[in-house]
Amino acid sequence: MGKLTFAERAWLEYLHWQAKDLKTLKRINMLLKDIDRNGNDGIGKPEKLRHRDGWSRRIDDVNRLVYQLRDDGSVEVLQCKGHYDD
């Protein structure tokens, strides 16, 4: 996997899933692996954000993985809980 970083908020959300819901954590990890392999194509219905820089993918009906894919191939996770800044 290329370089992966988490914004502070996203890391706290990731730790929440690690403690509370392993099924959701597994889905997040699967999405991150797919982003590494396929960029902005693949599973989770990748969608370019309209009002800010970045992309989102569906974790489930309620939660979204929001991230930025950098030119150097690195990924920064901005959010992994809620539905866009909820």
Where are these regions (language model features)?
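Enriched for short, Lys/Arg-rich terminal
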Residues: 1-4, 9-25, 58-64, 68-86
